[in-house]
C-alpha cells in the first residue's frame, strides 16, 4: 500500500509538471514545442549547436542543468558498500596480503606474470596495449582499468564474473595469462604467505600429501592437470577451492582501495552547483563547457555514461567494427551463461553472502537479442589516459571513438544501441575537450601503488 501511495504521489507530480510545461509553451506541438531534453539543454536536436537564452555565457546553467552536472560529480559518489560475498573485503590484513599477491609474479609458473603486468598503476591500472598481451601472445580483449570497479555488479567486459574476487581468480589459471593451476597457487601462497594468510583466514589446510594434492591440478584445458583434478576427492578439491577463493578475496580487498580521484570537472561541478560564474570560468574554457553541454544534451552520452563514475554498469552493443582476422565476440550473451555456472559466484559455497544478497545474480537476464555482442559500459574518469578504447582496443584515440559514434554503423550480428551523433568538427572537438577535464590519478594510499617493500 505504501508503494502505491508513493507511486500515486509521483504520478500526480509528473502530471502537474507536464501541465505547467504545456502552459508555458515548453512542451507540445508546433514551433513553440520542445522536448524535455531541450528544456534541460536549451538545444533543438542532434547536430545543432547548444544555445543559451539571450546570448548568455558558456557557464550559464539552469537549475535543472546544474542538477544534472552535480549528479556526475565525484562528490555524489556514495561510500563504498561492503561486498557481502567477501567477508574480508575491508580487512586491513587482507588488503596487505592482496597487495603482495597483486604484484607477485610467483603466481605464474615461469615467474613472469603478475596482476600488475597488465594492470599497471602508472597507466591507471591498464597496459596501453590494443589487446592484453602476455608472453608475446594476445588475449582476445583489451585490458580494462580496475580503478573504481568495486562499485560494479559485474566484472570483465562480458560480465562473466559477479564479484571482484571471482574475477581475480580467472586469470590465475588462464593459459594465456598467468597460466598456473589451482593446487600450485594454493601451495605457493600457503608456503610463502602462511602467517599472512592465517592472520586473515585462520588455520590453513595441510597440503603436504602430494598424493592427495598433486603439484599441478585444476579444472582447466590442460589434460594432465584436469586428470589430476578429477582424480582428487571431492573434499580435497573443496579444500583447494577454499584457499583459491581466499586468494581472490585478498586481491579484491586490495583492489577495493583503488578509487578514482578528484578531477577538474568535479571542481567545476561544485562551482556550477553554487552558481559561481567566476569560479566556473576559471576552471573551464567555453569550449569545455560547450562539450559538457553536448555530453548530457545533444550527445545523449548520459544515457549510458551517467553517475559519478560515468557508467550505468550495463551492457550495450555499439556496432564496433570486427578487427581483421578476429571472430565475432558474443559478449554478454555468453557471459551470462558463464556467470550462472561459476562455482565462485555469489550463490556458490565459497561466497560469504546470504542468498538474499545475491539480487543481481538471482534475477539475471540470460537471453535476448540485446545481449548479443553487448559489452560493459566503461567509466569515463581519466579516459584520456587509458587509450586505446573499447573491449577490443579498436580505437586508438578519442577522435576515432567520436567518429564512430557520429556515424553509428549498424551492428551485425545483434542490435546496436547507438543513434548517429552527426556532430560537426567543432562539436566533436568540444566534446573531447570536456572528456579531458575528467583526467585525474587514482585515489589510493601511495604505498598501494607500488610493490610492497621487500618484495621481489
Q: Whereabouts are the PLM-identified features?
A:
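Periplasmic c-type cytochrome electron-transfer domains
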Residues: 2-456
Amino acid at each position: 500500500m505504501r508503494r502505491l501511495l508513493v507511486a500515486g504521489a509521483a504520478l500526480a507530480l509528473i502530471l502537474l509538471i507536464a501541465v505547467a510545461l504545456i502552459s508555458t509553451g515548453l512542451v507540445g506541438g508546433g514551433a513553440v514545442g520542445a522536448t524535455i531534453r531541450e528544456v534541460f539543454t536549451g538545444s533543438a536536436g542532434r547536430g545543432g549547436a547548444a544555445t543559451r537564452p539571450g546570448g548568455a555565457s558558456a557557464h550559464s546553467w539552469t537549475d535543472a542543468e546544474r542538477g544534472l552536472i552535480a549528479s556526475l560529480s565525484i562528490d555524489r559518489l556514495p561510500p563504498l558498500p561492503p561486498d557481502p560475498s567477501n567477508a574480508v573485503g575491508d580487512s586491513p590484513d587482507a588488503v596487505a596480503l592482496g597487495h603482495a599477491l597483486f604484484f607477485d609474479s610467483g603466481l605464474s609458473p615461469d615467474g613472469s606474470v603478475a596482476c600488475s603486468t597488465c594492470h599497471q598503476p602508472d597507466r591507471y591500472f591498464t597496459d596501453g596495449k590494443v589487446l592484453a598481451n602476455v608472453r608475446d601472445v594476445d588475449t582476445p580483449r583489451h585490458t580494462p582499468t580496475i580503478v573504481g570497479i568495486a562499485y560494479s555488479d559485474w566484472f570483465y567486459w562480458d560480465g562473466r564474473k559477479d564479484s571482484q574476487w571471482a574475477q581475480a581468480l580467472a586469470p590465475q589459471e588462464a593459459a594465456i595469462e598467468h597460466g598456473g593451476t589451482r593446487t600450485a597457487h594454493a601451495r605457493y601462497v600457503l608456503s610463502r604467505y602462511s602467517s599472512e594468510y592465517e592472520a586473515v583466514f585462520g588455520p590453513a589446510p595441510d597440503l603436504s600429501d602430494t598424493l592427495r594434492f598433486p603439484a599441478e591440478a585444476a579444472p582447466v584445458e590442460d589434460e594432465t592437470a584436469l586428470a589430476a583434478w578429477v582424480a582428487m576427492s571431492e573434499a580435497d578439491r573443496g579444500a583447494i577451492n577454499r584457499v583459491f577463493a581466499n586468494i581472490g578475496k585478498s586481491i579484491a580487498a586490495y583492489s577495493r582501495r583503488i578509487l578514482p580521484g578528484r578531477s577538474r570537472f568535479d571542481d567545476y561541478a561544485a562551482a556550477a552547483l553554487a552558481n559561481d560564474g567566476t569560479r566556473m570560468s576559471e576552471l573551464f574554457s567555453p569550449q569545455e563547457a560547450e562539450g559538457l553541454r553536448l555530453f548530457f544534451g545533444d550527445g545523449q552520452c548520459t544515457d549510458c555514461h551517467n553517475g559519478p563514475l560515468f557508467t550505468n554498469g550495463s551492457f550495450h552493443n555499439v556496432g564496433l567494427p570486427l578487427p581483421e582476422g578476429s571472430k565475432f565476440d558474443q559478449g554478454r550473451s555468453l557471459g551470462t551463461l558463464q556467470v550462472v555456472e561459476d562455482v565462485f559466484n555469489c550463490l556458490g559455497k565459497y561466497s560469504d553472502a546470504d542468498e538474499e544478497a545475491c539480487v543481481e545474480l538471482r534475477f539475471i537476464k540470460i537471453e535476448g537479442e540485446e545481449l548479443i555482442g553487448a559489452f560493459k559500459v566503461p567509466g569515463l574518469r581519466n579516459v584520456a589516459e587509458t587509450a586505446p578504447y573499447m573491449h577490443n582496443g579498436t580505437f586508438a584515440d578519442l577522435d576515432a571513438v567520436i567518429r564512430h559514434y557520429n556515424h553509428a554503423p549498424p551492428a551485425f550480428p545483434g542490435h546496436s544501441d547507438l543513434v548517429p551523433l552527426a556532430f560537426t568538427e567543432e562539436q566533436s572537438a568540444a566534446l573531447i575537450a570536456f572528456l579531458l577535464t575528467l583526467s585525474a590519478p587514482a585515489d589510493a594510499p601511495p604505498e598501494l601503488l607500488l610493490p610492497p617493500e621487500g618484495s621481489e
